[in-house]
Curated annotation (Swiss-Prot):
Keyword terms: NADP, Oxidoreductase
Protein's UniProt keywords contain Ion transport: no
SMART domains tied to this protein: IMPDH
The species this protein was found in: Streptococcus uberis (strain ATCC BAA-854 / 0140J)
NCBIfam families to which the protein is assigned, alphabetical: GMP_reduct_2 (TIGR01306), PRK05458.1 (NF003966)
Lineage: Bacteria, Bacillati, Bacillota, Bacilli, Lactobacillales
Active site: 176 (thioimidate intermediate)
GO terms under cellular component: cytosol; GMP reductase complex
Annotated protein name in UniProt: GMP reductase
Gene field: guaC
């Protein structure tokens, strides 16, 4: 079965244009529905400590974008939910699967967040299934995202356990070294893995990792994603929480993986690394550019909303679309 499955990644695929039916690309609707809520773009800044903090989360929510707050400042999660709700903003947090997280989830019954993401590296696990069931029992109205996974079997199991969406991607990210350290993952075939998983899914899929260009967002939607989680493209902004570093007069921002020793604070089961990214402008400018590029994608797809992207044909070009250029 596996040998018969087409294997490709983002750089191997080109989408084939259809006749344009809109007068201006600005007419294209990039909004997406997730649960009971609509958001301006089908993108999520990765729930990593060098990508998002409470200030950025608050601004994203105010501006109509989806976000997932990371789980690495555990004590601040309840006050964060309270502060968001006081402003009539959605609260979207992350949890792990350790024993104390069960009591934490139960403690949220009086002020339940709208979204909870179970965030572990290998999401096809009994511990994740157990946590999904616990959240659904304690917080029945909360939308549960579970991950990360890389197979249809995992998607079906997590959905059957009660997950409202699954996050697909094992180690394809720019600062993830799972594929090197363990030999496992979807690195190098993330887009094919997304396609494979989406065929089995009955609920939304979130593609997570391996996004290097804005065009990859359109490709993710073509192959079954409802939303796309992105790390490196959202890192390095002026507002980004990563530490600012100056080298020879140039400024950089730190960006490191959630399973790196920099995140863990110890060199144990390390599956992430740290890199320096040249500082970019403001996050709002990147979001605007993403929207404009996605509107262009929709116009090439021959429609007026994201659904048009799901119907386009494609060709597999095996790494040739860059013609020797680097990203």
């Amino acid at each position: 079965m596996f040998n018969d499955m087409p294997v490709f990644d983002y750089e191997d695929i080109q989408l084939i244009p259809n006749k344009c039916i809109i007068n201006s690309r600005s007419e294209a609707d990039t909004s997406v529905q997730l649960g009971k809520y609509s958001f301006k773009l089908p993108v999520i800044p990765a729930n990593m400590q060098t990508i998002i903090d409470e200030t950025i989360a608050e601004q994203l929510a105010k501006d109509g974008y989806f976000y997932i707050m990371h789980r690495f400042d555990e004590e601040s999660r309840k006050p964060f939910i309270k502060r968001m709700h006081e402003q009539n903003l959605i609260a979207s947090i992350s949890v792990g699967v350790k024993e104390y997280e069960y009591d934490f989830v139960t403690s949220l019954k009086e002020d339940a967040p709208e979204f909870v993401t179970i965030d572990i590296a290998h999401g096809h696990a009994n511990s994740v299934i157990k946590m999904i069931q616990h959240i659904k029992k304690e917080l029945p109205e909360t939308f549960v995202i579970a991950g990360n996974v890389g197979t249809p079997e995992a998607v079906r199991e997590l959905e059957n356990a009660g997950a409202d969406a699954t996050k697909v991607g094992i180690g394809p990210g720019k600062v993830c070294i799972t594929k090197v350290k363990t030999g496992f993952g979807t690195g190098g075939w993330q887009l094919a893995a997304l396609r494979w998983c989406a065929k089995a899914a009955r609920k939304p899929i979130i593609a997570d990792g391996g996004i290097r260009t804005h065009g990859d967002i359109a490709k993710s939607i073509r192959f079954g994603a409802t939303m796309v989680m992105i790390g490196s493209l959202f890192a390095g902004h002026l507002e980004s929480p990563g530490k600012l570093v100056e080298i020879d007069g140039e400024t950089f921002k730190e960006y490191y993986g959630s399973a790196s020793e920099y995140q863990k604070g110890e060199h144990k089961n390390v599956e992430g690394k740290k890199i320096l990214l040249p500082t970019k402008g403001h996050l709002s400018d990147t979001l605007t550019e993403m929207k404009q590029d996605l509107q262009s994608s929709i116009s090439y797809a021959g429609g007026n909303d994201l659904a048009a992207l799901r119907r386009v044909d494609y060709v597999i070009v095996k790494n040739s679309i860059w013609n020797g250029d680097s990203i």
